[in-house]
Design a protein with these regions (language model features):
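Membrane-helix interface linkers and caps
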Residues: 2-57, 71-87, 167-173, 220-235
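Membrane-interface helix caps and helix-loop-helix hairpins in membrane proteins
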Residues: 7-8, 78, 142-150, 195-202
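Membrane-interface starts of transmembrane alpha-helices
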Residues: 9-20, 123-132, 174, 200-207
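Juxtamembrane helix-entry segments on the extracytoplasmic side of multipass membrane proteins
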Residues: 81-97, 145-156, 202, 206
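Membrane-interface helix/loop boundary segments of multi-pass membrane proteins
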Residues: 106-131, 169-174
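C-terminal membrane module of polytopic membrane proteins
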Residues: 171-176, 180-246
């Protein structure tokens, strides 16, 4: 996202780019439902009582997938990251706060905190997830254009949407947990991708798409079209009196 923010897009207010979706969500929620709309929006963004296992899933699944990507890249001929590149063990933790603010906080608050709950209930969570994934691919197109591989980036974006919504639906539809998932995923990308260059970097991009896609397929096969391990509770799936996305 930082590459886009340094480009000609929104040259006067580049810092607002990652917050476009949440700004739109706040405006629409205020206009359509007023205070109650904002309350519902904030409740999803701040929903933290979801069980420790889903915090672990949101934070550790991206780490595991990133390690698999690095392993496969090295196995395919890329040089092993050096000790200097890896740095101290806590170095990756220093990337987390900046990654949190740089995109996930603004994006997921808008997409999962506001937009996704208003998708049609007549479709399965998986179908809505794939629709959202396509929208997110379009949203991230400016960033994809400066990525090592445009196609790999967009495929990975859709696949990551499946993983993110798996967390979302199992964590009581908490946008907060998806924010953490997105932050962990971006942190891993910012940590490992700069360790490669040239053809190795392009291969790493395709491994990102392949590993995330494989993980998404496994989750779909295990959980089915609901993406849930257990049936959703009525409180988690209460429909909002808002216009639905067709």
């Amino acid at each position: 996202m930082s590459l886009v923010r340094r480009s000609a897009i929104w040259p006067d207010f580049p810092f607002l780019f990652p917050f476009g979706s949440v700004i739109a969500a706040i405006i629409v929620a205020s206009i359509t439902r007023g205070r109650s709309g904002l309350k519902d929006f904030l409740s999803r963004c701040l929903r933290w009582r979801v069980g420790l296992k889903w915090y672990a899933a949101a934070l550790l699944v991206p780490v595991a997938l990133a390690l698999v990507q690095v392993f496969l890249n090295v196995l395919s001929g890329a040089p092993m990251p050096t000790a200097a590149q890896l740095g101290p063990w806590f170095g990756v933790l220093l990337l987390f706060p900046d990654s949190f603010i740089d995109a996930p906080l603004g994006e997921e608050s808008g997409w999962r905190g506001f937009a996704l709950p208003r998708f049609s209930a007549s479709r399965s969570p998986l179908t809505n997830t794939l629709i959202l994934g396509a929208l997110l691919a379009g949203w991230h197109l400016p960033l994809a254009l400066v990525a090592p591989s445009v196609v790999a980036y967009l495929i990975g974006t859709v696949a990551s949407a499946v993983l993110a919504n798996w967390v979302y639906y199992n964590a009581r539809e908490s946008a907060l947990l998806v924010i953490l998932y997105h932050t962990a995923s971006n942190t891993m990308g910012r940590y490992f991708f700069p360790m490669f260059s040239g053809a190795d970097l392009v291969r790493m991009s395709w491994l990102f798409a392949a590993v995330y896609s494989l993980a998404a397929v496994v989750l779909i096969l295990v959980n089915g079209p609901t993406l849930r391990r257990q049936p959703a509770t009525q409180a988690d799936t209460a429909q909002l009196p808002q216009p639905q996305i067709p």
